[in-house]
From Swiss-Prot:
Homohexamer; trimer of homodimers. GO terms for biological process: purine nucleoside catabolic process. GO terms for molecular function: purine-nucleoside phosphorylase activity. The lineage of its organism: Bacteria, Pseudomonadati, Pseudomonadota, Gammaproteobacteria, Enterobacterales. It catalyses: a purine D-ribonucleoside + phosphate = a purine nucleobase + alpha-D-ribose 1-phosphate; a purine 2'-deoxy-D-ribonucleoside + phosphate = a purine nucleobase + 2-deoxy-alpha-D-ribose 1-phosphate. The keyword Transferase applies. Its EC number is 2.4.2.1. It is an enzyme of class 2 (transferase). Pfam families: PNP_UDP_1 (PF01048). It comes from Salmonella newport (strain SL254). The active site is at D205. The record marks R218 as: Important for catalytic activity. This is Purine nucleoside phosphorylase DeoD-type. Phosphate binds at G21, R25, R44, R88, V89, G90, S91.
Amino acid sequence: MATPHINAEMGDFADVVLMPGDPLRAKHIAETFLEDVREVNNVRGMLGFTGTYKGRKISVMGHGMGIPSCSIYTKELITDFGVKKIIRVGSCGAVRMDVKLRDVVIGMGACTDSKVNRIRFKDHDFAAIADFDMVRNAVDAAKALGVDARVGNLFSADLFYSPDGEMFDVMEKYGVLGVEMEAAGIYGVAAEFGAKALTICTVSDHIRTHEQTTAAERQTTFNDMIKIALESVLLGDKE
């Protein structure tokens, strides 16, 4: 039945949901890549859709910005609508010079300055990692599509406008590939409620060089990332 944030019924969502931050990007993904699309959520403007990709039922829905927002939606999708796999498809900022604008990054793990997972994990550090099979399927899908995807750690930040520029040096030293705001929270929710999760990001801006894509490009041109996510779902069905 409907929750305070999702006005859908059991069965409206597929067992796999792709989740961008922007609900308009969710609409674009549904209209561009899925067939037989229908809207299944519009509460607070957080649009959700279900359709088929190559005959496979798949849903796509926005999760908003930051760990608090995405944690609400992912928790409800898992516990109230039977969703088994979450694939975040979003943008990130690069901190390493060998990571370029529009590179695709597969988030094997996610560091964070948020305390959300410590609260969940009784004030201990929780290793926020993606599901291994989902990582492997995304890597295989990228190879099949001819996309040179990077695999490694992301950093999920609580602050978009961070005053601590020195932290970027620490991230670079530790090999962090990109900075975003949700992966660690989504991985924590998935672990807590017995689901599986993965984050795939496209580099939308470079923190070192100040290169950036436009808002319109972020909404419509990150197609490689979406194709990798969708094809990885099909590979997962063969396991």
